[in-house]
């Protein structure tokens, strides 16, 4: 009964008039992502597992990564997926649908597309180091994507930490850590050094706060920098991002 109500819920127009809908699910409705996921499970997941049993894939909502061995296979699978989606009333996104070459030291050929972003991570050729053989090489690795890094920096800036001069450092850290711990938990699973610029950006705001709060630091960036280094040394767990090893 509740599912039926969700599906038949009218659409509120800009002029305040309720319009009756005849298809689809309400945009932003609680049932919409659930129904979409069930639909794609049978419309895509079950189909590709049956038609291409040797091809691995990952799907999150309507974003999919399909792993192929050769370019020829990739083109065949892409064409088949296009036909399948058309048969169930969907289509491939013309800009986001790409064949990407996973370039590394063992796959050195040159292709136009050598990176993609999935679930906030950007996968591309990156420098790596073999500790056993003590040599550098290129691997195809994920790291927090540029878009997500920019989003995190903007979020940090929006907090305007420097205005909270009536708070002490521990009170300042509380709400900040609630958000930053989530970022670190997800985005440091692979290539954690990618998030260090965000950590330094947060440190910059902490130092701005310190210069406004303490008169002895007000006109000295050097002393503020030394102050922050001292706090990190005394209380390395005060801010969640300080658990990463990086220079200020």
What is each PLM-predicted segment?
Residues 1-248:
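Non-catalytic terminal/accessory segments
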């Amino acid at each position: 009964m509740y599912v039926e109500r969700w599906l038949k819920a009218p659409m509120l127009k800009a002029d305040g008039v309720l319009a009756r809908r005849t298809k689809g699910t309400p945009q932003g409705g609680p049932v919409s992502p659930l129904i979409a996921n069930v639909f794609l499970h049978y419309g895509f997941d079950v189909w590709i597992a049956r038609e291409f049993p040797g091809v691995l894939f990952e799907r999150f909502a309507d974003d999919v990564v399909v792993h192929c061995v050769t370019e020829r296979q990739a083109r065949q699978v892409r064409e088949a997926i296009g036909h399948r989606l058309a048969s169930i009333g969907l289509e491939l996104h013309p800009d986001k649908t790409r064949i990407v070459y996973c370039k590394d030291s063992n796959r050195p050929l040159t292709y136009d597309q050598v990176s993609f972003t999935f679930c906030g991570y950007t996968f591309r050729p990156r420098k790596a180091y073999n500790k056993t053989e003590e040599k550098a090489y290129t691997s195809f690795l994920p790291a927090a994507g540029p878009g997500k890094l920019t989003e995190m920096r903007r979020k940090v800036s929006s907090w305007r930490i420097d205005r909270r001069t009536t708070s002490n450092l521990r009170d300042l850290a509380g709400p900040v850590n609630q958000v930053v711990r989530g970022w670190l938990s997800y985005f440091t699973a692979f290539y954690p050094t990618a998030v260090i610029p965000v950590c330094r950006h947060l440190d910059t705001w902490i130092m701005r706060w310190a210069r406004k709060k303490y008169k002895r630091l007000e006109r000295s960036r050097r002393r503020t920098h030394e102050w922050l280094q001292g706090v990190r040394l005394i209380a390395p767990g005060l801010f969640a991002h300080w658990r990463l090893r990086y220079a200020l």
